[in-house]
């Protein structure tokens, strides 16, 4: 199947090995993992960054290769339970940040047709994601606009 905004096909990659339980060398208490997840969220880390930190640094010096295997919950579920989640989903937030950067670039370089198209594609993805999240993680009346995105992220 082709990519969304190009005619290229996707490249296949390796799959993560399936596992039903965490490895023996990574035995950390579930509560300690959840506390560390909330602590990292309060420091300003996104859920994907929290997963990387736990994988690389771990909890109490012991790496946690997969939070869901260790706790039975995803990082975002842990954040929701502890009221530490962001107001915007991470993927939508990242796309909005990209759109803001592209819009500022277009203001400085109005003749840059390639990045004008990149901005259009990014804003299309944002609108598509807003439709997906509207009513669940976003308000029913939420609509994307550059000014609104800039206010929310700064």
Swiss-Prot record:
Superkingdom in the source lineage: Archaea
Pfam family, one: Ribosomal_S13_N
Lineage of the organism: Archaea, Methanobacteriati, Methanobacteriota, Stenosarchaea group, Halobacteria
Family indicated by similarity: Belongs to the universal ribosomal protein uS15 family.
GO cellular component labels: cytosolic small ribosomal subunit
Keyword hit for Ribonucleoprotein: yes
Entry GO MF terms: small ribosomal subunit rRNA binding; structural constituent of ribosome
Gene3D superfamilies referenced in this protein's UniProt entry, alphabetically: 4.10.860.130, S15/NS1, RNA-binding (1.10.287.10)
GO biological process: translation
Name of the protein: Small ribosomal subunit protein uS15
Assembly with partners or alone: Part of the 30S ribosomal subunit.
Gene symbol of the encoding locus: rps15
Matching SMART domains: Ribosomal_S13_N, Ribosomal_S15
Organism of provenance: Natronomonas pharaonis (strain ATCC 35678 / DSM 2160 / CIP 103997 / JCM 8858 / NBRC 14720 / NCIMB 2260 / Gabara) (Halobacterium pharaonis)
InterPro entries: Ribosomal_uS15 (IPR000589), Ribosomal_uS15_arc_euk (IPR023029), Ribosomal_uS15_N (IPR012606), uS15_NS1_RNA-bd_sf (IPR009068)
Record's compositionally biased regions (Acidic residues): 21-32
Region feature Disordered, mapped onto this chain: 1-32
SUPFAM superfamilies (alphabetical): S15/NS1 RNA-binding domain
Matches recorded under PANTHER family: RIBOSOMAL PROTEIN S15P/S13E, SMALL RIBOSOMAL SUBUNIT PROTEIN US15
Keyword Transcription: no
Signal peptide per UniProt: none
Bias type Basic residues, positions: 1-10
Keywords in alphabetical order: Ribonucleoprotein, Ribosomal protein
């Amino acid at each position: 199947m082709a990519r969304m905004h190009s005619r290229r096909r996707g490249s296949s990659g390796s799959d993560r090995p399936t596992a039903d339980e965490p490895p023996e060398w990574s035995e950390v208490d579930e509560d300690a993992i959840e506390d560390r997840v909330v602590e990292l969220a309060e420091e300003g880390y996104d859920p994907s960054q929290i997963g990387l930190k736990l994988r690389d640094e771990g909890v109490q010096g012991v790496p946690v290769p997969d939070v869901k295997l260790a706790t039975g919950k995803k990082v975002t579920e842990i954040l929701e339970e502890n009221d530490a989640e962001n107001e915007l989903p991470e993927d939508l937030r990242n796309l909005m940040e990209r759109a803001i950067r592209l819009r500022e670039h277009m203001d400085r370089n109005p003749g840059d047709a390639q990045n004008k198209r990149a901005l259009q594609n990014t804003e299309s993805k944002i609108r598509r994601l807003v439709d997906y999240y509207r009513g669940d993680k976003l308000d029913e009346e939420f609509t994307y606009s550059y000014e609104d995105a800039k206010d929310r992220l700064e």
